[in-house]
Amino acid sequence: MASRRLLLLCLAGLVLVTEAGPTGTGQSKCPLMVKVLDAVQGSPAVNVAVRVFKKAADETWEPFASGKTSEFGELHGLTTDEKFVEGIIKVELDTKTYWKALGISPFHEYVEVVFHANDSGKRRYTIAALLSPYSYSTTALVSDPKE
């Protein structure tokens, strides 16, 4: 029970840190941002490969965007407001490669977060993940765009 409370506290802190974020990064104009933390090291998860897909009319997943997390465990600039229209989005984090690079054999191959974007009008999405080799937790911060 105590470990669950600690995990929830960490995730809440992650969202607050993400919202506060460094100034001057342009994140307020970014409609989709990913933030990843390493729960083992207690630090940002650097160089995690992220792939974003959009569900097509034929129910297949079309590649939409990709990148790697920064030294802050963040990935900005995946898309623009013009391109990020309503639809089903899948964000995939390559956790296996991340852990293998640290010499750790993980349980999960990757983390997937699937959600309906912009179904209630334009929004900003921050997908946050807290990783360990045998578990992960995700949360999302959805907000109205700031002009």
From Swiss-Prot:
UniProt keyword terms in alphabetical order: Gamma-carboxyglutamic acid, Glycoprotein, Hormone, Secreted, Signal, Sulfation, Thyroid hormone, Transport
Main localization of the protein described in the UniProt heading: secreted
Record's signal peptide: 1-20
InterPro entries cross-referenced by the UniProt entry: Thyroxine_BS, Transthyretin/HIU_hydrolase, Transthyretin/HIU_hydrolase_d, Transthyretin/HIU_hydrolase_sf, Transthyretin_CS
Superkingdom of source: Eukaryota
Subunit structure, as described in the record: Homotetramer. Dimer of dimers. In the homotetramer, subunits assemble around a central channel that can accommodate two ligand molecules. Interacts with RBP4.
Official protein name in the record: Transthyretin
Gene designation per UniProt: TTR
